[in-house]
């Protein structure tokens, strides 16, 4: 399996969205940038902030679209084309309603599952053959409450659980970057 060359965090731009559940993907890549002592740089032709981090002996691009979630594909496709990266070499970190806060899972391929950022990416790519980091944010219990839920801020307890999940995901990232996706999944998905 090909190793990773690009990690994307999904979220919505603007200070009013910074701490929302929907920005779990941004939280993941922001954590990587901070941990590695890097800085985001605006790359207007990619409609994104970009950074590079050194993981598992190689440089990996990080991309944080400046478009809203439902238009993320434009930025991602621009990045893939500009850096000549195959979708199979990309990991997209996003919020996941189907998992409780604190749960985090890796997945390769599939549909969008109702996640609007993934919907736009798969539409523009024409397929879903890329890696995903699914960060649990919980579900409000009824589909009519989903929009307010994802655009709302997690509770203190939920934030602690989400942060712990992002730390666990960061710990297996060297395996993912090196192309050992199965081992990364085994470590991340095994509850000790």
From Swiss-Prot:
Signal peptide: none annotated. Its main location: cytoplasm. InterPro entries: Pept_tRNA_hydro, Pept_tRNA_hydro_CS, Pept_tRNA_hydro_sf. The record marks 95 as: Stabilizes the basic form of H active site to accept a proton. The keyword Ribonucleoprotein does not apply. It catalyses: an N-acyl-L-alpha-aminoacyl-tRNA + H2O = an N-acyl-L-amino acid + a tRNA + H(+). It holds the Pfam family Pept_tRNA_hydro. PROSITE patterns: PEPT_TRNA_HYDROL_1. One of its GO terms (molecular function) is tRNA binding. It is an enzyme of class 3 (hydrolase). The keyword Protease does not apply. GO terms for biological process: protein quality control for misfolded or incompletely synthesized proteins; rescue of stalled ribosome. One of its GO terms (cellular component) is cytoplasm. The record marks 12 as: Discriminates between blocked and unblocked aminoacyl-tRNA. Monomer. HAMAP family: Pept_tRNA_hydro_bact (MF_00083). Belongs to the PTH family. Hydrolyzes ribosome-free peptidyl-tRNAs (with 1 or more amino acids incorporated), which drop off the ribosome during protein synthesis, or as a result of ribosome stalling. Catalyzes the release of premature peptidyl moieties from peptidyl-tRNA molecules trapped in stalled 50S ribosomal subunits, and thus maintains levels of free tRNAs and 50S ribosomes. This is Peptidyl-tRNA hydrolase. It comes from Xylella fastidiosa (strain 9a5c).
């Amino acid at each position: 399996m090909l190793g990773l060359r690009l990690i994307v965090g999904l979220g919505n731009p603007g200070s009013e969205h910074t701490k929302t559940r929907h920005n779990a993907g941004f939280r993941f890549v922001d954590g990587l940038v901070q941990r590695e002592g890097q800085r985001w740089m605006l790359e207007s032709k990619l409609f994104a902030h970009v950074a590079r981090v050194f993981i598992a002996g190689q440089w990996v691009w990080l991309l944080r679209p400046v478009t809203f979630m439902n238009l993320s594909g434009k930025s991602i496709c621009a990045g893939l084309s500009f850096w000549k990266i195959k979708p199979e070499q990309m990991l997209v970190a996003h919020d996941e309603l189907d998992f409780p806060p604190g749960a985090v899972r890796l997945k390769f391929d599939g549909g969008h599952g109702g996640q609007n950022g993934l919907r736009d990416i798969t539409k523009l790519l024409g397929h879903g053959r890329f890696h995903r980091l699914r960060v649990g944010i919980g579900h409000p219990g009824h589909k009519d409450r989903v929009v307010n839920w994802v655009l709302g801020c997690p509770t203190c307890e939920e934030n602690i659980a989400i942060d712990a999940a992002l730390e666990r995901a960061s710990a297996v990232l060297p395996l993912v970057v090196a192309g050992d996706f199965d081992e990364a999944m085994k470590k991340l998905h095994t509850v000790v």
